[in-house]
Amino acid sequence: MTRRALVSVSDKTGLVPFARRLAALGVELLSTGGTQKALAEAGVPVVGVGDYTQAPEILGGRVKTLHPRVHGGILYRRGLASDEADVKARDIPPIDLVVVNLYPFREAVAAGKPFETCVEEIDIGGPTMVRSAAKNSAHVGVVVDPADYEKVAAELEATRTLSAATRFYLMKKAFAHTAAYDAAISEYLTAREAPEAAPAHFPATLAAVYTKAYDLRYGENPHQAGAFYRAAREPEEPSVAFADVLQGKELSYNNLLDLQAALAGVMEFDETACVIIKHNTPCGVSTGRTAGEAFARARECDPVSAFGGIVALNRPVDEATASELTSLFLECVIAPGYDAAARAALAVKKNLRLLEAPRLGAARATWRRRPEEGRELRSIPGGLLVMDRDLGSVRRDDCKVMTKRAPTEQEWKDLLFAWKVVKHVKSNAIVFAKDDRTVAIGGGQTSRVESVKTAVMKAALDVRGSSVGSDAFFPFADGVEEIIKAGATAIIQPGGSMRDAEVIAAADKAGIAMVATGMRHFRH
C-alpha cells in the first residue's frame, strides 16, 4: 500500500491534479521548496521535508533531502528483518513513492547562461532520490515523467499499490532520466575549454544525450525497425533534425538521410543554389538568379535520377519556384521558407514533404558550430567511430597549378564549383561542371576511371568545355585520358599519387589544365 510520497519537481506540468489524486487516497505528501509552495497554494495538504526530518535546508538550498530519514525511508527493504529493525530504531517511516524531476540544467545551457549559473543548476538531491527509489523498485515507485502521472494515479486508485511491472517500467525510465542528465553535464563540460588548458580533441569518455523524437515506419528497408532521436540542443547552423515539417507524409529513415545530404550540399553556397539528392548522393547541383532557375538547371544534369529526389534550396520558395518544383515528382523539399502562394501551389502535392529551416536563409558567416557539432559519429558493432566533419574547403590561392597551362578565369570558376560538389558525392567521385552547375556526376564506383566513364555515360548535358573535380588523386593516367576524351578542359584534384608525373604528362599532352588542392574528400 502506498502511504507516503515525496514530491519535488522542477517541471510542474500536471503536478497539482496528480497530487490531489494522491491526497484523496490518503497518501501523505512530503515536499520541498517551490513544489511545496505550489501544492500549499493549491490547497493540497503537504509536509515540508525540513519539518519531516527536523533538519532545515542549509547552504542556500543545496542540502534539503540528503538525510537518513528520507533515504532510509526510500531504500529500506520491506520485510527484511535487519532493515525493519534499523528503521524502527531510528523512527524512519516508509516512503513508497518518489515523484522527482531534475533541475533544468539543459535549459540553462541552451539559454546560454554563464558557467556558474549552469553549475548551480546541477541537481544533487534529485538524482540521489531517483536512484535510491529506482534501486529499491521492488518496494518503491519512482516517477520522473509527468506523462506517467495518469498511469500511476489510475493504478493507485484501482489497487492502492503499483504492480511489479509498473515499478520496473518506472525504474527503467528513472535510470534513463539520470543517465541522460549526467551525460548532458559531461557533454557540456567536455565542450567547454578549461581556463587553464585546452581540452583533448577527443575526450577519453564520450557522453551524448539524444531523446527519441518519434518512431519511424521502418529503417532503411521495411524489415528493419527504425526511430529518430534528437539532440538535446538545437544546432546554431541549419538542421534537418530541428526543421519544421509543414506538409506531407511522415519522414522516413531514408528521407532524413537524404535531407541531410541535400542540406550539407546547399550549405556550401552563398549564391542562390539548389541541390538534388538521390540515394544520399547529388544528381544535380546549380546556382541561379532565382531559386526556381537554380532548381531547373540542377534538374537538367540528370532528369531521370531527379525523379523522386530530395531538393534543398538556400533561398525562400516563391510561387514561380513552386511551379518548377511541382513539375516533377519529388519526395522532399527543404528551404528557408515558403510564401503563401508557394504553399498553396505545393499543397496540391499532398504527399510531398515540405521542411522549413529558417537558418538556411542566413549568411553562412553567421553560422556557429559548438565543438560537439563539428564531429561525425558512426557506429560499428561494439564501437563508435568519431571524426571531425568534413568542413574543409579551398580557395583559388590554396591550389597549385600542376600543368604547363594554367586554368582560364572561367575554368577556375568551374573548378571551384566542381570542388564544392565533389566532396558530397560517394567515392570514387567525379563531377563535371560548367557555368555554375553540374553537367555530369559519377560516383560510388570502385575505380576512378569507372566513375569518369559513368559520369560521361549518364550525362544529359554537353560535357565538352567543362571542368572536372575528383575527390581523390588519379592513381593512373587512364581517368584523365577518359576526361580528355570527353572534351573537358580542366581538372581539380588533391594530387599526391605515386604516378602524378604520368597523370600530369597526359594532361600536358592534351593541353588541358590541372590543379592540386592538397585536400582529399573521400566519402564512404
UniProtKB/Swiss-Prot annotation:
The gene is purH. Gene3D superfamilies: 3.40.140.20, Methylglyoxal synthase-like domain. Keywords: Hydrolase, Multifunctional enzyme, Purine biosynthesis, Transferase. It comes from Anaeromyxobacter dehalogenans (strain 2CP-1 / ATCC BAA-258). InterPro entries: AICAR_Tfase_dup_dom_sf (IPR024051), Cytidine_deaminase-like (IPR016193), MGS-like_dom (IPR011607), MGS-like_dom_sf (IPR036914), PurH-like (IPR002695). The lineage of its organism: Bacteria, Pseudomonadati, Myxococcota, Myxococcia, Myxococcales. This is Bifunctional purine biosynthesis protein PurH. Its EC number is 2.1.2.3, 3.5.4.10. The IMP cyclohydrolase activity resides in the N-terminal region. HAMAP family: PurH. SUPFAM superfamilies: Cytidine deaminase-like (SSF53927), Methylglyoxal synthase-like (SSF52335). Belongs to the PurH family. Pfam families: AICARFT_IMPCHas, MGS.
